[in-house]
Amino acid sequence: MATITPSSISNAWLIPGASFTVKKSDCSIKCSFSRKAGKQILSSTQRLVLPLSTSLRLFPTHGRQFVLHPHRRATGTDVVAAVEEQDSTPVVAEDKETVASEKSDAPAPTSQSRGTARPGRKSEMPAVKNEELVPGATFTGKVRAIQPFGAFVDFGAFTDGLVHVSQLSDNFVKDVSSVVTIGQEVKVRLVEADIESKRISLTMRENDDPPKRQSGGSDKPRSGGKRDGSKGGGQRKGEGFNSKFAKGQMLDGVVKNLTRSGAFITIGEGEEGFLPTAEEADDGIGSMMMGGSSLQAGQEVKVRVLRIARGRVTLTMKEEDDGKFDETTTQGVVHTATNPFMLAFRKNEEIAAFLDKREEEAEKPPVETPVEPEAEASVTSAEVEESVCVPAEVTSEEVPSSETPKVVEEEVIATKAEDDSPEKEEQTETLAAAAEAEEVVPPIPETKSEEEIVENSIPPNSATDEVSSPEALASEEVEKEQVVAETPVDEVKTPAPVVTEASSEESGNTATAESIKGISPALVKQLREETGAGMMDCKNALSESEGDMVKAQEYLRKKGLASADKKASRATSEGRIGAYIHDSRIGVLLEVNCETDFVSRGDIFKELVDDLAMQVAACPQVEYLVTEDVSEEIVKKEKEIEMQKEDLLSKPEQIREKIVDGRIKKRLDSLALLEQPYIKDDKVIVKDLVKQRIATIGENIKVKRFVRYTLGEGLEKKSQDFAAEVAAQTAAKPKAKEEPKAEEAKEAVASPPTTVVSAALVKQLREETGAGMMDCKKALAATGGDLEKAQEFLRKKGLSSADKKSSRLASEGRIGSYIHDSRIGVLIEVNCETDFVGRSEKFKELVDDLAMQAVANPQVQYVSIEDIPEEIKQKEKEIEMQREDLLSKPENIREKIVEGRISKRLGEWALLEQPYIKDDSVLVKDLVKQTVATLGENIKVRRFVKFTLGEDN
């Protein structure tokens, strides 16, 4: 609140922080206060006469803020402290615009002095001579400065030209910065150039006629630049700012953009209004507490026209009745609140209406009834709640009372007669404190406001309503204001079970309900964030553990694990297939099932699948899901080995059995995925992690199967002895000298005349085939420069070289995967000779295409026909031989027909025999050979595995 200090000069009041506007030398001087100053208005009896000269001497710092307006007022000079609202930003901007426009029309000497203030002005645009400054001429310039009344453009003339805000566009322009920015290149047209006063007027409008504008401007000479204030002002107010809206009109609008002081609302075709922050529905609480407005761009809002000033429409989201609360505040009626959140509740429309309704019910005269022990206990508990609302200054006053001990003794006897439990003794102490609070309340001074007295007469269930009202009426504010339900609420809640009942069961249920209500929402939210359980589960857990977070977490974990065990019997037909590839050398394909497709697409389930796939990749010893999947033969074999160890021979038979079982269990647990410690938290086992997710999601989850590939496992790399290879290659051979001569002679005879091959043909063939330069040159020379024949020559040579390279050992390569819609997944391993080729882009593309090929062919089960077991081939052959259409055929012909049918049938099961999905004219095996010819290394598709969601293993 702004402080008012007396001054010895003319007995005037000095008001810091106030801005003054002088309407005229003999008019009233108004002092503006912001909302932060308390919104207090001085009454008419407090107006003081202050001469203009004295006021000017008292406030020298505000000398430049005085604006003279020609409207005559009363002859007296009054200082009025008026309540100015925060939505005055547009009006202030208009005043600044008026001042600036008046300054722009100042006399010529002022403009000249302004022009001479910067003689060394440097222009970035080409120089424009004064002879070229003809009205209607078009120039290109850059925006140098932006003012509320227009923009200054540098186009190379002797000074910057002014584009008035009304000349920026053919449409209405509210904000200059929304049309142009500093440094922007714009196209302008000259309206007027006054070389003597060094002023240039420009326009950016396209529909105006320059001669008419010039003739209109030349009707009145610019002698000194003065305006007829009375005529001009009347015309602007009367004609230029006609609005089609009326004060108090309700409109539907859309938020256009947001500023610090408010928001601009589109309320019609081309019409906009300004909504100050203080006129929003929440009184600007969102901007103060959250750091920004509660509105968003594009949001549809319902607004009311608050006022129309100079064509500018100021809007509000409040109803007309909201002003009554401000009037009562300025008249000295102040609500008593125990903390700032109560004030925030009072500013909210819905909560304030609820509190007012409750206060109206409290003001009704109570019905006089005989006080019974139960009623007396409830009344005293209500008095305890009233004492929470009493200010600290009032409760700190100690008023002696001789009747208090007697009342306390009677209440103690009444409560002990009903229940002698320790809880009742604590309640008795609370009642004693309530009785003291009751005696303290009467001496409150009469100067207290009506609102404060009403709050002290809140009914007994007010504390409970205060706890539940943020959840019921303003659920969106509970997270911001959870501190409201902390220590004061807990203190009020403890005497709640004072009302005793005859039945012990009813009292137990009431105590449970009250204990659940007494849990702080902040604790519930914290427990939800830490455990991921439901709100009611967290509430029940906190009530069971009496607010202890650790015990509540243990309670939820036990309950979650128990519910997970119950849900383990449910069927799981949906789920997700995931994959994890580590450095293209370790690959995992995993299937996890759940009950519904909705859960399988959730983020929690996706994260679980990814974590389990990573877990499999991180545990190389894992081979099974659970220990039950291990075959009995392996268990028996392990048991026999353990029983024969020397350290157990000296043990008794019974102890030996237990030791062996423990060792075998430990060994089997190391092979099972669900028994491994979780890699992100080694205190949790994987199966417990799955149970936690079951408790969180509420559906059964099962890890169905997984496959793990390690690059090159099972392959024996050939040990290379370079010394032996070099010695073998350089060893003398008897026929080596004679054979080359014969070959050279044959080549000399058979070689055709050499043709000249151009470098352009070699380059074109290299781009089309990807072969080496010498290979392309030889191919063109052999085919006489024919590109098509050269391509065939290279393809045949490449395939033949690929066949030669197929005998090389391929132990490097890449592991890839492809997941289609999380329902079909493929894990594939493709080998090559060196790691360099395995990391090349061409090889990566081949692996990805082969994985996609395997997904696109559901009947494919093997890599090649040679990988199909002989049992399956024999079975297919027997089936084909027994067909009726072959019984009449001769034996020789029947064999050939069966072989053809079997090869076709087996080709459908082999991946390499399928037509390539991106080019069905090429088989997959031919694609691999082409890649071998391009990369120059042997490539082998070693293995792949395919999972389809829901299929049997």
Swiss-Prot record:
GO MF terms, alphabetically ordered: mRNA binding; translation elongation factor activity; translation elongation factor binding
Name this protein carries in UniProt: Polyprotein of EF-Ts, chloroplastic
Transit peptide listed as a keyword: yes
Compositional bias segments (type: Low complexity): 369-405
Keyword Signal part of the UniProt annotation: no
Organism of derivation: Arabidopsis thaliana (Mouse-ear cress)
UniProtKB keywords: Chloroplast, Elongation factor, Plastid, Protein biosynthesis, Repeat, Transit peptide
Coiled-coil regions listed in the entry: none
Ranges for domain S1 motif: 136-205, 248-318
Any Pfam family hit: EF_TS
Record field: compositional bias (Basic and acidic residues): 93-105, 121-130, 201-212, 219-230, 416-427, 735-747
Residue ranges with Polar residues bias: 458-467, 501-513
Superkingdom to which the source organism belongs: Eukaryota
Region (Disordered): 93-130, 201-243, 359-514, 731-750
Stored PROSITE patterns: EF_TS_1, EF_TS_2, S1
Transit peptide: 1-80
Subcellular localization(s) per the UniProt record: Plastid, Chloroplast
Any single GO CC term annotated in Swiss-Prot or TrEMBL for this entry: chloroplast ribosome
Mutant lacking the gene: phenotype: Defective embryo arrested at globular stage.
